[in-house]
């Protein structure tokens, strides 16, 4: 959809090769994360990925990998009937946010994305959002407004994701925010979330951001919109082991120690 910060845009001609993970490859990766204490398993797809195929994959994961983990999807637009079906088939939550400068730095219709959020909120699914992708171009007011709108939607998981410059995209020459700025934003979001926001997520995670109030971080692999290349290993060398270590360094207790 040619978002100005995303490596996936056809217009930018950055991604040259097609990669499709088999169900077996996905199951193997999920199993590693679950066995090492991952609480959420997020399946991120391209905008128009087949929902029936995704449901089939979710059911395979639930059948073959035991555990108390929760499955979250980051997918395209859908209606209430689909939301209810996803829940019935084992999905716990949906990541679907209105990004900063949606419709300007992206080519998505804000109203369409809001409609999908409403479908999630009217179903048993849990809505997950982040203030993202935060860059030096965004004002305090934009960031605060995005977060407060998310809070009004009773999102259990909120937080912030920094924009990672990808050369070749329109925003690729704009520097990223500093780790200090990201930590500051996380601290403000934690204090402002009150008793509504259960978890504060930060991505990419830093120790300062974790110490500032984030308690959820992301380990990702595969097609990453913040990278010009396919990522067969954990992106930016953030592994499930290093995630545990980072959280433990900030005095959080996790299921495993490394």
Predicted segments, located by residue:
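Local cysteine-cluster metal-coordination motifs and their immediate loop/turn environment
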Residues: 1-11
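Core AdoMet radical
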Residues: 10-25, 33-53, 57-58, 62-120, ...
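A general structural detector for well-ordered alpha-helical segments in enzyme core domains, enriched
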Residues: 26-29, 54-61, 82, 112-119, ...
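Conserved C-terminal portion of the radical SAM core fold
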Residues: 43, 93, 108-171, 186-200
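Generic structural signal for helix capping and beta-alpha/helix-loop junctions
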Residues: 50, 103, 137, 167, ...
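Catalytic cores of alpha/beta
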Residues: 79-88, 135-151, 203-213
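Auxiliary Fe-S-binding modules of radical SAM enzymes
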Residues: 151-258
């Amino acid at each position: 959809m040619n978002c100005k910060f995303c490596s996936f845009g056809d217009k930018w001609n950055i991604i040259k090769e097609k990669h499709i993970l088999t169900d077996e490859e996905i199951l193997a990766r999920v199993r590693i994360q679950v066995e090492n204490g991952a609480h959420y398993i997020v399946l991120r797809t391209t905008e128009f990925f087949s929902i029936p195929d995704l449901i089939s994959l979710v059911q395979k994961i639930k059948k073959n990998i035991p555990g108390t983990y929760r499955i979250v999807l980051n997918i395209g637009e859908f209606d209430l009937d689909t939301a209810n079906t996803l829940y019935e088939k084992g999905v716990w939550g949906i990541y679907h946010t209105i990004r900063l400068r949606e419709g300007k730095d992206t080519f998505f219709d804000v109203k369409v994305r809001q409609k999908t959020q409403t479908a999630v909120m009217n179903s048993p699914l849990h809505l997950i959002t982040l203030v993202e992708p935060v860059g030096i171009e965004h004002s305090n007011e934009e960031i605060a407004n995005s977060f407060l709108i998310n809070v009004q939607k009773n999102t259990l998981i909120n937080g912030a994701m920094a924009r990672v410059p990808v050369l070749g995209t329109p925003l690729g020459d704009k520097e990223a925010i500093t780790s200090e700025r990201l930590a500051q934003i996380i601290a403000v979001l934690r204090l402002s979330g009150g008793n509504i926001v259960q978890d504060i997520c930060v991505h990419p995670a830093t120790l300062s951001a974790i110490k500032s109030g984030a308690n959820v971080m992301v380990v990702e692999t595969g097609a990453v919109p913040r990278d010009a290349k396919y990522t067969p290993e954990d992106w930016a060398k953030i592994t499930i082991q290093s995630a545990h270590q980072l959280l433990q360094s900030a005095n959080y207790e996790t299921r495993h120690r490394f």
